Amino acid sequence: SDSAALFPEYVTRAVKQGMEYANLLPSIVATTTTIQSMDYRTITASPSEDDKELKPVVEGAQIPQTVVRTQDNLVKLHKRGRMLVSSYEALRFQKLDLFTVTLRQIGAYIARAQLKDAVDVLLNGDGNDNALTPTSLSSKPTYTDIVKLWGELAPYELNTMLASTVTMQDLLNIDEFKDATAGLNFQGTGKLVTPLGANLLHVPSLKDKTIIGLDKNCALEMVQAGDVITDYDKLIDRQLERATISTIAGFAKIFTGAAKAASYTA
């Protein structure tokens, strides 16, 4: 029917497709927690360097312990949404595919906004005294600086790097990043990798001249309150149909040491 274009299930499906297409979150989020409330307090563990070694335990001796506790502050959740308003004429005389493109684009906007929230938590913390202190570089990043970032992240693995457009341009001009194998991978898959094997992700919302390196397997938790929410109604006196799409999500750090940052001014 004419109103099928704004049918809630169709809207939800199209928006999710757009979110998945533009979604970099699976590349930086270790786990996703779905809740049915607006309040959520995550857990944390802060093992010392000695704890991470797991030294031998003699028979009958006490086994060392790692303490897991809840965080002091709640995870900050953000509601993101958009209303799509369409006239009866637009629905009646236009192809459904055009509305699908529009809805997918709304989904892409939501995914990018959530990525911005995630990067902000990585850099500035989630309110539990766990903001990053970027290492200051004297000039544009060099291969030595990237290796140093890799070393600072140990014992975690540097498998993901985040950079803005300007920073990406500086990184890709490093001689080691022009490696033929890396270039071939980019041409074949569209994915950038570093000489150290870490995936290099383009995050336009990240502050320029700042690099974030992380272990995606244990750095960040995504918390979402339910799924994509869609509501639909009609304004008969104006012959308009409306659909609202919204999501509620937030982010929290899991292991603070699993992410490091570097910045430069040159």
Residue map of PLM features:
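Helix N-cap / beta->alpha transition motif
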Residues: S87, A163-T167, D215, F255
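Hydrophobic alpha-helical bundles in membrane proteins
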Residues: V68-D72, Q94-K95, G125, M161
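Sequence/fold signature of self-assembling virion shell proteins
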Residues: D175-A266
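Glycine-rich, charged/polar anion/phosphate-binding loops
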Residues: R69-T70, D145-L149, D227-T230
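Alpha-helical scaffold segments that mediate packing/assembly in large oligomeric complexes
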Residues: R80-L153, Y264-A266
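Extended, solvent-exposed, turn-rich assembly/linker loops in the middle of proteins
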Residues: N124-L192
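Assembly/oligomerization interface modules of large self-assembling protein complexes
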Residues: D2-R80
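Short helix/loop capping segments that flank catalytic or ligand/cofactor-binding pockets
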Residues: D51-L54, T66, Q94-K95, D170-L172, ...
